[in-house]
């Protein structure tokens, strides 16, 4: 599944209107090497970890304490980002008025649990 997160934390972390993530079950993923992890309190008030490439510093992944069985990858960092299509927009209450979301995605004012 792919989702767009419009929370202020993702906006600040990406320097963009939202972060586009492809979400996978953590058990189905293996990484070649270990990202550099940065732990913060997200817009939900819960801890999140953002993983960055240790070679170039590009943002790669996100792990949520609130959803320990999944891992998100920045969609544009994947080998074939066109393979994924957003199904959901999260934290739409934080979206900018000029951020035109796709009409056919599920919209949530808060996070996954809302």
Where are each of the predicted segments found?
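A short Gly-Trp-Pro
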Residues: 1-114
């Amino acid at each position: 599944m792919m989702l767009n997160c419009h929370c202020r934390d993702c906006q600040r972390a990406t320097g963009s209107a939202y972060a586009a993530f492809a979400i996978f079950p953590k058990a189905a993923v293996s990484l070649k090497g270990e990202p550099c992890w940065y732990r913060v309190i997200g817009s939900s008030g819960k801890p999140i970890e953002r993983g960055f490439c240790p070679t170039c510093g590009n943002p790669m992944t996100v792990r949520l304490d609130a959803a320990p069985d999944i891992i998100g990858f920045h969609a544009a960092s994947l080998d074939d980002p066109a393979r994924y299509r957003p199904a959901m927009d999260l934290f739409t209450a934080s979206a900018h008025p000029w951020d035109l979301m796709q009409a056919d995605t599920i919209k949530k004012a808060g996070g996954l649990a809302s």
